[in-house]
Amino acid sequence: MIDSTRYPRLSRIQTPDDLRTFEEADLTAVADELRAYLIESVGKSGGHFAAGLGVIELTVALHYLYQTPVDQLVWDVGHQTYPHKILTGRRDQIHTVKQKDGVAPFPKREESVYDTFGVGHSSTSISAALGMAIAAQRNGDDRKVVAVIGDGAMTAGMVYEALNHAGGMDPEPNLLVILNDNRMSISEAVGGLTKMLGRASGSRTLNAIREGGKKILGDKKNNPTARFVRRWEEHWKGMFVPSTLFEEMGFHYTGPIDGHDLPSLVGALKTLKTLKGPQLLHVITTKGKGYELAEGDQIGYHAVGPFDPSKGLVAKAGAKKPTYTDVFSDWVCDMAAADPKMLVITPAMREGSGLVRFSKEYPQRYFDVAIAEQHAVTLAAGMATQGAKPVVAIYSTFLQRGYDQLVHDVAVQKLDVLFAIDRGGVVGPDGATHAGNLDLSFLRCVPHMVVMAPADEAECRQMLTTGLRYEGPAAVRYPRGTGPGTALDAALTTLPIGKAQLRHSGARIALLGFGATVDAAEAVGRELGLTVVNMRFVKPLDKAMLLELAKCHEAFVSIEDNVVAGGAGSGVSELLNAEGVLMPMLHLGLPDSFQHHASREDLLAEAGIDQAGIRAAVLKRWPQLMAKGQQALNAAAG
């Protein structure tokens, strides 16, 4: 429970209705308590941190002035929504964020009526809010709809599709877009738009003149004086402020204003509430505001584990196993030294994808395209047509956003593009929006693709080299976190395409493990005396080995950290069917549902693809193996 002596105002707020009982003069004190409580809470639980600190005042102002949940707030991405959750009935549970059965890390409609739209990926808020505004208008509802979007998310093309639609509608939608401009996404925001917005923060005088003129002249299009002023402004506006872009798209632009000045925020929002049609409010904020260490290291404090706020983040001592991301990070630098044709592309995920070192050592071969997955993939395709060897470093969940480009621009033309796909399979605490549960299914159906899934760190390095040297599109899909700890070979060696690895020779049943499931499968196979295969390739499958195993085994069990539907196991069944081989098969994988947020270990166990789950599934199907398993357990215990 919250300490009412430390938080005398916040302790009285369970919902925004409680917030609205305060006088406007008290809001700054409420914001100060909310910021302190967020620092204390995330220090205990971990979670997304700096983004929430940057929108404390904005969150308070919005819930104070708008009649939420009747008026609807749509938060882009959701990294910044912990303060929103605290003010909307989840204050005393916020310490459970990201934990199994705890508060969701992103807005989730099933969790609260105040979470009006589920998010996790960026740049969706304006489209969603516009849809809500249109539906409300058609229903005769006089509700306000507000989309809050960061400048990093504004780099995605979907944003401009929504702005273009909203600004050209008749009747005009009752929509407010708030641009939360902190010059950051997860990493530093990049690109021409970011530079343009950056100029705005130094143009307050000109903006004041513009806004004053609007009040005097009004915005009536037929006012001759106003038309003259607008023509004069056309000559100068591009030099100073970003209003041109938004106003030419049909939005009334206000700002920029200080997003940490509550009186200014409240005043601006009061005015905007009275206006009709699409509005855009530009606020300048600081990511990590109010916690000095986070302000100084906005990337490092974007998402944190539990820590002591009085000390800040402390590096863990001692050697640790490299993560798969670390393996990729080292490989990409080693390969760049060996192959001058290699170029690397990332859609705004330099830190997460392990490209910090590469970006510093090879800046002319590193391309951060901002949050633009579609562009990233087609950019790689264009590079490949000129003999370059592009690598697209991307999270599995974000590759979904560039799927048409993967098919249409890369695979159809059989171009040499390597997709280094991080966070494949079960991801964990970030929940369904960040899971990589679908990638093997949507990759293996694409003609010309080679799809690989490493069982360990050494194999990951080999597969990356194999994919880069393959003539055609290739994908290496690896999980979040660490592997089994296999020693790495500095050599840049390749694997034969489509060849599996026999891990253990047994009898009766063959366990076919793909990727991160191989270690657990091998442990079960050795215990029960079964054959175990590290399949390595999801496409092409090792046809020769599968047909040979089919001659001397009674059944196959496919095991993958991907949905069963259309996955690697389905490919095995299709191959056997095409060859006229009748073989009983048990497919183990992820369920036909979106998994909730929990630890990776919890989710693997729930899906039955950890060691205990594989063992239980095999024995349930073939109970006659129980005696063998019991003998092994007795031997281990004795």
From Swiss-Prot:
Q: What family is this protein classified in?
A: Belongs to the transketolase family. DXPS subfamily.
Listed PROSITE patterns: TRANSKETOLASE_1, TRANSKETOLASE_2
- This chain belongs to the protein called 1-deoxy-D-xylulose-5-phosphate synthase
User: EC number(s) for this protein?
Assistant: 2.2.1.7
Q: Which cofactor does it need?
A: Mg(2+); thiamine diphosphate
Origin species: Xanthomonas campestris pv. campestris (strain ATCC 33913 / DSM 3586 / NCPPB 528 / LMG 568 / P 25)
- Pfam family example for this protein? Transketolase_C
Any one GO cellular component localisation term in the record: cytosol
Q: Please provide, alphabetically and separated by semicolons, the GO molecular function terms listed in this UniProt record.
A: 1-deoxy-D-xylulose-5-phosphate synthase activity; magnesium ion binding; thiamine pyrophosphate binding
Catalyzed reactions: D-glyceraldehyde 3-phosphate + pyruvate + H(+) = 1-deoxy-D-xylulose 5-phosphate + CO2
